[in-house]
């Protein structure tokens, strides 16, 4: 189980991402359409002035049951350990164990 503080930190990053997402997208579109280098430098300074935790790359997917940051399956939003337990307990319908 992950520490509660780490899970809260991820939630805070997600909120910041949502808050600045539209403005960041606007600045990036404006930068791609601008030809002047001076204007691009100004836009880059504005981008750098945004909070670091508002970038989408700082957000890490976590298991929603345990908070484990590694080995997550996107389809289920679960870590591999919990996914395996739930499959064996028949809690995920339609998922079968592979055999060949």
UniProtKB/Swiss-Prot annotation:
InterPro entries: Ribosomal_uS14, Ribosomal_uS14_bac/plastid, Ribosomal_uS14_CS
GO molecular function, one term: rRNA binding
One Gene Ontology CC term in the entry: small ribosomal subunit
Any one Pfam family match given in the protein's UniProt record, by short name: Ribosomal_S14
Highest taxon listed in the record's lineage: Eukaryota
UniProt KW keywords: Chloroplast, Plastid, Ribonucleoprotein, Ribosomal protein, RNA-binding, rRNA-binding
Function: Binds 16S rRNA, required for the assembly of 30S particles.
Family that this chain belongs to: Belongs to the universal ribosomal protein uS14 family.
The protein, known as: Small ribosomal subunit protein uS14c
Source organism per UniProt: Anthoceros angustus
Lineage start: Eukaryota, Viridiplantae, Streptophyta, Embryophyta, Anthocerotophyta
């Amino acid at each position: 189980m992950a520490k509660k503080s780490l899970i809260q930190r991820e939630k805070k990053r997600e909120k910041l991402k949502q808050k600045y997402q539209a403005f960041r997208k606007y600045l990036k579109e404006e930068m791609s359409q601008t030809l002047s280098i001076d204007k691009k430098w100004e836009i880059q300074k504005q981008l750098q002035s945004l909070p670091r935790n508002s970038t989408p790359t700082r957000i890490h997917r976590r298991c929603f049951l345990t908070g484990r940051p590694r080995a997550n399956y996107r389809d289920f939003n679960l870590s591999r350990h919990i996914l395996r337990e739930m499959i064996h307990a028949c809690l995920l319908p339609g998922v079968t164990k592979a055999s060949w």
